UniProtKB/Swiss-Prot annotation:
Organism name: Methanococcus maripaludis (strain DSM 14266 / JCM 13030 / NBRC 101832 / S2 / LL)
EC class name: oxidoreductase
Lineage, uppermost ranks: Archaea, Methanobacteriati, Methanobacteriota, Methanomada group, Methanococci
Binding-site positions, a 2,3-bis-O-(geranylgeranyl)-sn-glycerol 1-phospholipid: 368
Tree of life domain: Archaea
Reaction(s) catalysed by this chain's protein: a 2,3-bis-O-phytanyl-sn-glycerol 1-phospholipid + 8 A = a 2,3-bis-O-(geranylgeranyl)-sn-glycerol 1-phospholipid + 8 AH2; 2,3-bis-O-(phytanyl)-sn-glycerol 1-phosphate + 8 A = 2,3-bis-O-(geranylgeranyl)-sn-glycerol 1-phosphate + 8 AH2; CDP-2,3-bis-O-(geranylgeranyl)-sn-glycerol + 8 AH2 = CDP-2,3-bis-O-(phytanyl)-sn-glycerol + 8 A; archaetidylserine + 8 AH2 = 2,3-bis-O-phytanyl-sn-glycero-3-phospho-L-serine + 8 A
InterPro entries named in the record: DGGGPL_reductase, FAD/NAD-bd_sf, Geranylgeranyl_Rdtase_fam, Geranylgeranyl_reductase, GGR_cat
Entry keyword annotation includes Zinc-finger: no
Protein name as catalogued: Digeranylgeranylglycerophospholipid reductase
GO annotation terms (biological process): glycerophospholipid biosynthetic process; membrane lipid biosynthetic process
Length: 390
């Protein structure tokens, strides 16, 4: 196996979608790039529901090797069983096999020129006059590699950003605990529609059913200390809302993880470093979804890294172009989603039912701000929750 070089233009830590897209764009634009992944196999372990937006928007062909289902929309299901159908262009997407998809993104990066080090761990980084010394345990051997730019894409528990003095540690109260079964013999409402369930069955979160070809991802995300996520999920499997639809369901895989739903970190750049993906809080606080957002922000980080190398300017002032780019496109959306999440977490089952009865049964998208007017008009008692949106 090829040893690591003494120096690189860019070192990306973490080969999830954000890291692979960042390294891909950095390499494609001429930067000598190293991508470091702690797992021995990229894409494992899988920790999410595996839904992604339209891949065509990223110039990626939705290959059947990793695309398991085409998604046209979803059902929002209130505690009383009332269904709201959300279906339109913005809701189109796919459910993928993350083990294959993540590896595909890494292969694509490798083909663009990135060197990839799997089963490798960054133990620390040290600031130098012109970049960072990155300490790497690579297949059991210790290396110190120099890098002009470091991109921290090392997930929700990011240490790399912390090493650089950027505050990336997440408040435990803002980490959504997730558990998921991949199951066969599940009867879906529609094989091209996702299902979302809300209420006391999943405190401060939701339960999802995502079509995945011959299987279905049945999962939950909760922010609650009374019971484990898996306990709530097991109770749901026999809940009247899904009566007769999961009776013969058989699990073929089990996944757990944590989702940062407290919004983006305050600062994602400093001299010689950028933070991206879950490490940066590039996750919707409302839905917990973040693959597409992380991919896009990864592309931005890789592009700015390559520009930085060409300009021989690795300062915070130069790299701030990355922060300006992602904030211009996503910051308002993320902060609005944080506001909506905080409102929805306070709602009782009766109030959720009242909302379901107040809004149209068919929507093209879920815009909580716009829906608030209709909700309050039909259920004035909910004004105390939604008044800041009016």
């Amino acid at each position: 196996m090829k040893a690591l070089n003494d120096s690189y233009d860019v070192v990306v830590v973490g080969a999830g979608p954000a890291g692979s897209m960042a390294s891909y764009n950095a390499s494609k634009n001429g930067a000598k790039t190293l991508l470091i992944e702690k797992s021995q196999e990229i894409g494992t372990p899988v920790r999410c529901a595996e839904a992604v937006p339209r891949l065509e928007d990223f110039g990626i062909n939705p290959d059947p090797s990793f695309v398991k289902s085409y998604i046209r929309g979803g059902y929002l299901i209130a505690p009383n069983g009332k269904k709201i159908v959300v279906k339109g262009g913005k809701t189109d997407g796919y459910v993928v096999e993350r083990k294959v998809f993540d590896k595909f993104l890494a292969i694509r990066s490798g083909q663009a020129g990135t060197q990839i080090a799997v089963k490798s761990r960054v133990t620390k980084i040290e600031k130098t006059d012109d970049g960072y010394n990155v300490f790497v345990n690579y297949l059991g051997d210790e290396y110190i590699v120099k890098s002009k730019i470091v991109i921290a894409a090392d997930g929700v528990e990011s240490n790399i950003a912390e090493y650089a003095g950027l505050k990336s540690k997440k408040n435990p109260k803002e980490i959504c605990s997730c558990a998921e079964y991949e199951m066969t013999n599940v009867k879906l409402l529609n094989n091209e529609m996702m299902e979302f369930y809300f209420g006391d069955i999943c405190p401060k979160g939701y339960i999802w059913l995502f079509p995945k070809g011959d299987t279905v991802n049945v999962g939950i995300g909760v922010i609650d200390s009374k019971k484990r996520a898996i306990d709530y999920l097991d109770e749901f499997l026999t809940h009247p809302l899904v009566e007769g639809r999961l009776d013969n369901a058989v699990p073929v895989e089990f996944k757990v993880g944590g989702d940062p739903v407290g919004g983006p970190i305050k600062k994602t750049v400093a001299d010689n470093i950028m933070v991206v993906g879950d490490a940066a809080g590039h996750v919707s606080p409302l839905t917990g979804g973040g693959i597409g957002l992380s991919m896009d922000c990864g592309l931005m980080a890789g592009d700015v890294a390559a520009q930085s190398i060409k300009a021989e300017n690795y300062s915070e002032e130069f790299l701030d172009l990355y922060e300006k780019k992602w904030k211009e496109k996503y910051y308002k959306l993320l902060m609005n989603d944080l506001k909506y999440k905080n409102i929805l977490q306070k709602l009782s089952d009766d109030e959720l039912n009242a909302i379901a009865n107040s809004i149209p049964e068919n929507l093209e998208e879920v815009d909580v701000g716009k829906l608030a007017i209709k909700i309050v008009a039909k259920a004035p008692s909910l004004l105390r929750h939604f008044k800041e949106l009016l």
